Amino acid sequence: MKITVIGAGNVGSSVAYALILREIANEIVLVDINEDLLYAKELELTQSIAALNLNIDLLCTKDYTHTKNSDIVLFSAGFARKDGQSREELLQLNTSIMLDCAKKIKDFTEDPLFIILTNPVDFLLNTLYESGIFSSKKIIAMAGVLDNARFKYELAKKLNVKMSRVDTRLIGFHNDDMVLVKSYASVKNKNISEFLNEEEFEDLENEVKTGGAKVIKHLKTSAYLAPASACIRMLESIRSGEFLPMSVILHGEFGVQNKALGVMARLGLEGVIEIMKMDLSLQEKDKLEKSLIKYQYKGE
């Protein structure tokens, strides 16, 4: 499998490193405009391949001709979110970068699986869909797996249990309007309503929603290890067939038409295979509906 990673910053290089460790691709192309950064990353990554004695070809380059016939393209270029900055404020900054890169990829690969890792993922995915560069089922954005990991982590920490005993799901946008699906969340096969009252769940929601901001505050840059791990989980699901939360273009599901929204879905090299139907509670439906109206996905 050939995977191209666009952007050799913290997220992109972490993804490339994880691809090596998990042996997901036998050919990796890392693209960036910063030659010094590329040189350093190529040394680090190729020496990692040598240390692990793996049969993986890796190339770090500015030249998009080397991306030809990529099976998967992971877009992680653009500006990272700063302390106090919303994901929405990033949209204008990162839109032109993404569209330019997507057009260059299109010149050498007709219709790869294109996964957006750059924020704001949902709205960048909308823009990419509207551009018509790639088919709608082949464009996806990663965020739900990361948010769900934060949900699992915070719930396990709050209840002092192992994360492996916790099962969580969420849908919606990769921002403060995400919907943690309480009705599908369980600990040791028991719904979390048996462990948390409404106030405690609201506190948990806040911790999950501020997960990224907490990293930015203390690290002075956006998270990158957990996002890279979430991306790898998505790629490995292509083989496992498991449902994972991800932002996809909907065509009527959840009442959304031709817009990107985080849902539980199954992924293949051919794109989105299946979207999970979910029996949401009235409260969960109301939260989702309000967010759809807020972002003008629906009229009031």
UniProtKB/Swiss-Prot annotation:
Q: Name one GO biological process term.
A: tricarboxylic acid cycle
Position of the signal peptide: none
For molecular function, the Gene Ontology terms on record are: L-lactate dehydrogenase activity; L-malate dehydrogenase (NAD+) activity
Q: Which domain of life is it from?
A: Bacteria
- Residues that coordinate or bind NAD(+): 6-12, 94, 117-119
Q: Which residues of this UniProt protein bind substrate? A: 81, 87, 119, 150
Sorted alphabetically, the keyword list is: NAD, Oxidoreductase, Tricarboxylic acid cycle
* SUPFAM superfamilies given in the database record: LDH C-terminal domain-like, NAD(P)-binding Rossmann-fold domains
Q: Which residues form the active site?
A: 174
Which EC number(s) does UniProt give? Answer: 1.1.1.37
Q: Which family does it belong to?
A: Belongs to the LDH/MDH superfamily.
Q: Could you identify this protein by its name?
A: Probable malate dehydrogenase
Q: Which gene encodes it?
A: mdh
